[in-house]
Amino acid sequence: MMVSSLKAAAVVAGLIHTILAAIIGTTTTTPGTAVPTLTISTAVASPSASLGATLPSQAPLPPSQGWCIGQIFCAGSLLQTVNVAQVYSDPKTFVDKPTSKSSQQVLADFSNFNLSTVTEGQIVNFVDSDFLGEGLELEAAALTNFNPTPAFLNNVTDPLSKAFAQTVHGYWTQLARNTNQSAICDEYPGGTCESSLIPLNHTFIIPGGRFREQYYWDSYWIIQGLIQSELYETVNATLQNFMDEIEGFGFIPNGGRIYYLNRSQPPLFIHMVYDYVNVTGDTSILQRALPLAEAELAWWANNRTIEVASPYTNQTYMMAHYAVNNTAPRPESYLTDYLTIHDPTLSTPLTDNQAAELYSELASGAETGWDYSSRFEAIPQLGNPGLRSLNVKNNIPICLNSILYKARILLAELYGTSNATASSTHLQVAAGIRAGILDLLWDPAKLAFYDFNLTSNARNDIFTAATFYPVWNGIIPNEILASQSNAFGYFAAVNLVVNKYNGTVPVTFIDWTGLQWDAPNSWPPLQYIIMQALRTIPSNLTTNGLPTPSSGQSTYDLVPAGQLALTEAQLPGQPLLGAQANQNATATGPAADINKLSGTVVNGGNATAGEGWRDTLQREMANRYYASVLCSWHATGGSIPGLLPQLPASELNLTNSIGNTGNMFEKFSNLNIDSSGYGGEYTVQAGFGWTNGVLLWVASTYGEQLVAPQCPPLVAASTTTSTSAAVGLQASSGAVITAVMMAFMAHAFLL
């Protein structure tokens, strides 16, 4: 029989391992003055069947991928067999394990198996015998210039908020890594071992959890925090690593593993260089950075840019899209992709061409950084089953084109008068991108940006937080500049969130799809982008206070007509607390704005006299983000001596956090600020680089406006979500696909 889905036991074992692996052992010396003791965790095999069971039959192997060299960590018989055996609950675990033998010996050992009779136990023994611990190629790094009390802390007036910022500042010492030169394998195929790691020459900060290597777009928000922490050498080192990758590969890959070499991530390298130079005044880096920035932009222009004709104006533009050349499962998510393609419940299996195209779409979805979201599905409400309708390559995304526009603007500024010709060229290209964004992606009636869908030759109608990318990057449509009312209308959904929900702004308002880039999840980078977009609005458009809904209406009625493409009743519900637990707030009308009433938690800070609407929303966003991070950290064992005692064991037991000292999560719930986010292909990760970076930026930027948050009691929180959901331990539903949905999707396959 064909392998079908992850077994519950494997998922539970993987969840337990993930929580244990999230706790990094360190010494107790002054942060940064000594190398922390890094505990390399080795996952315990948790196969989906008994060790004596024969492996399920396999689908035919996908084509070999020219961009991925090797037969162990790239698509092939060995990788597919280990994944079909489901040795680990997270497919990334295996591909992060260096071999303990030469490539030839590992392949020879594997060739001894008869794949029609091989058992789970034989594969487990093979992996245990021929592979070492995941992440062994990295070692903890000392941050020699670490300052325990950076100047930004003086901006924070609330004692608890200040102490928490200082605590988070100290986490950099636990996330700093170097390549462990003694554990590096020689270049394939020679040497005594093989590894998937791309060795880097300089210190870097990892996101945390399963993300053991340097990542591209994560590093932008990590750098925002490192700058506040005055760790400028670490910022420089991060940029040097990226420049090494551009020199070696012609682009910056998604992350520091060979299995990422067919795709990039949102191209924020030039943004990072600009911020570093702007803060430090170190222009010496530009001698190397400018030519390599040109090379990266050329890669995006040559590999990800197409001509698009506007149905609105008949003008033609060169616009970028995410489009990865790939015809096999992603090695780090092999089983997930394999099951998406080869589900036995399909009444009509995909053809080879359809499978190859969907593999390309799955990889392209990962390149967006939003892996995955209903934003890129042809049938958004289907959630995980809808991954079969992924239409990433046929969308012209708001985010990517906005970033590339600003990259050209920043590069022109970095050139200045030293190369007027290059500067002028980039400004000209930027003007073309800007015109395309305003024509194709901006809806002047709805006062929002939407991705342009090449399949329908029209804008999508799904409202996402990506709408704020253009203004963050300096593209402000004339309609926004026309009046305070219009400027507010662009941010009206943010106002709705701070009135209707307890947390921060979700990715979309499409909820419980099982996809991690949908509601109720809210992500640190998006909160940063929204706050920066608010800061970009000219002050003459922000003097009025927040508008008030008319009698009988709610803040939903302040949102421009059609902007959300959902009725008020279709928006996600906000669970109530206390005596009203186990029910949601009223869905429509004035009572839907629960933060003006009782039965909820308000964490918006304190208003000041004469505060305009822009500043009110910034204050609300800053405090809510701080509350989400601090409360979920406290709920998982975090404490601050003299200010915030650790929760009793009876409450920590609700979050499986006894013995833990607080987790910094990668994503949060906008419904429950005690909780991490939900869903996705892997369990929620702790660490966490970009969460820390955004929090330190918020502390530095809004420190005087921060107040100690009100965290809802965990007992109440546990009545509105499952125990696992309370800490974000909701297993991926990517492999749990119903026959009805799959049969429908096979019929409706649109790619």
What is the predicted role of each segment?
Residues 50, 55-59, 63, 67-68, ...:
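Extended glycan-interaction surfaces of carbohydrate-active proteins
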Residues 725-751:
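Cleavable C-terminal sorting propeptides in eukaryotic secreted/cell-surface proteins
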Residues 3, 13-36, 723, 745-751:
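N-terminal signal peptide
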